[in-house]
Amino acid sequence: MTDPLIPAVLVFRDNGTPFSPLYDDIYHSAVGGLEQARYVFLRGNSLPDRWQGRRIFTVLETGFGMGINFLMTWAAWRADPLRCERLHFVSTEKHPFTVGDLRKAVAATISDPEIAALAQALANAWPTLVPGTHRLEFDEGRVVLTLVFGDAQERLPALRLRADAFYLDGFAPARNPELWTPMIFKALARLAGEGATFATCSSAGDIKRALIQCGFEYRKVDGFGWKRAMLVGHFAPRWRVRRHEPPAPLAVDERHAVVIGAGLAGCAVIERLAARGWRVTSLERHASVAQEASGNPAGVFHPMISRDDSIASRVTRAGFLYTLRRWAALERLGHAPLRGGQGLLQIAADENEARSISEAIAAFGYPGDYVTPVSAAEAQRLAGMPLARGGWFFPHGGWIDPASLCAAQCAAAGPLLERRFGVDVARIERSGGQWTVFDTSGEAIARAPVVIVASAHDAARIAGLQHAPTRSIRGQLTLLPPGAVLPPLQMPVIGEGYAVPLADGVTLTGATYELDDPDTSLRADGHLENLERVAQMLPAFANVADPARSTALTGRVAFRCVTSDRMPMIGQLADEAQAALDAQRLRGAWPLDLPRTDGLYGAFAYGSRGLVWAALGAELIASQLEGEPWPLERDLAEDIDPARFLLRALRQGAVS
């Protein structure tokens, strides 16, 4: 179970130095935090020289604290005309500051106006204090900060990245010994790229021994300020110290990808690849974007709360928070999708659920800007009409027009995107490092070194997957005209069903959930089912749940694509043919052991959570493709890996 995130407590010593009472240690040298960062970590890792001429450079830090090392690294990157194209800075933090305390800490420490401006940008982007991985982007996405909130002993082994430099900057080993254990250094060794360097203020004997045991070489140099010595060094193992190599970028002659499908999944991939400079060809069988399940007039987005903080809850939390940042970035670029005001209510199924979920919210320590339990009276005030029960309020949840989101993402891709509609893809073939896409007439219609299949129900067929058990679920929506329910609903309400007040006064309700039902026609019993379920939450809707009136209602039918475990299929696809040949050897395999198909990725089976999964899924695929740090923990990525069903079949001896 996920441990609650406990924020740092900020106090200041008499000399003004930020201090942690939890660890009885200072956050930076009293001689000067900026100078310490420059001397110990930048100079200690030979930066900026080592990133010059590189496309991607990745720094991994243990202990973000108040972010001074990141700010100084960012400033050095900005000042270097030979800087790398994209700087990744990944940092763990068990006790992050609240944004208010972060502002206080940097205000007391930083007088340099350039660094202060960067600190202000960091504070403005500071994530919600919930456990997990939070990816922030600065300088048009060329500087990427990935904050990993939680215990480093648990979080470092869950990272998937190739580090070029390590900043070992936890509190002193005597104050915070858990951050200097052999387990930590083993985790770092697993993540070290070729020639990776490190620097640390400490020169303790235990640390030296742990470094050597894990494949690092060190040397002692003059320390900073009152410290007599510090350690610097590099990764130079004399024997194999890890089972799997860190991720590397796909070697391609041309940065060009074909994306099959232009719904929520495909358009998110288009935007994330184009943001990295990839040329993208979009193939869509319909006449425009978002024509199938992504074409509903509105969709709701919100986190998922569970008593045990399940895998689905963790993936959805990461996706929800990342999605909000991506949408805000689109809006800053002038590509604003149509969405409602902030706020969404989830109504408990009964009093027992209301109590247990409220207890879970308290136990996990979720902050009020993420979720808040509400009574029936409080929920009624927010919704503007009576409710059957209380539940919980998501202040940043809401509704959005999916088609407008897809259009905004394509617009953000600009001239790097070629869009082709009315194209019905039948199959793909790989030869000579290139994928060729064929239509249903057998004609080759596109070629590229990379293909991302984001076509929902057709994805497994196009990719030739045998171990991708997806199914179709029919969903019928019901639209109520303005004034059908009074007083009007003020925000989306979800629970057994959902009701969404749209911008034009129409209220959207839904949706039915009918497995393997291919009927595309609107059905009166479907409208009635939707309204009756909503009426269980919102009694005012009982007046419109009338069988005699249901035949006159309008709506829409769409089909969700889901897997048997209800998790999406996101990431590089396995080479199933090669896995079958190696089935005996792979029977006890882990996901990283599986053979993968070069240049072939999937983004499908999003079910009813496409709005909160698509952006994160696209970022994961782009990161895998580029050899960048993954935007979520490895165990979560494995739970949405398209190869997970192949892996289960191998373990059961069902592949031959």
Swiss-Prot record:
Domain of life, source organism: Bacteria
Keyword match Nucleotide-binding: no
Gene Ontology CC terms: cytoplasm
Annotated protein name in UniProt: tRNA 5-methylaminomethyl-2-thiouridine biosynthesis bifunctional protein MnmC
Organism: Paraburkholderia phytofirmans (strain DSM 17436 / LMG 22146 / PsJN)
UniProt-annotated stretches for the region tRNA (mnm(5)s(2)U34)-methyltransferase: 1-236
Required cofactor names: FAD
Record function comment: Catalyzes the last two steps in the biosynthesis of 5-methylaminomethyl-2-thiouridine (mnm(5)s(2)U) at the wobble position (U34) in tRNA. Catalyzes the FAD-dependent demodification of cmnm(5)s(2)U34 to nm(5)s(2)U34, followed by the transfer of a methyl group from S-adenosyl-L-methionine to nm(5)s(2)U34, to form mnm(5)s(2)U34.
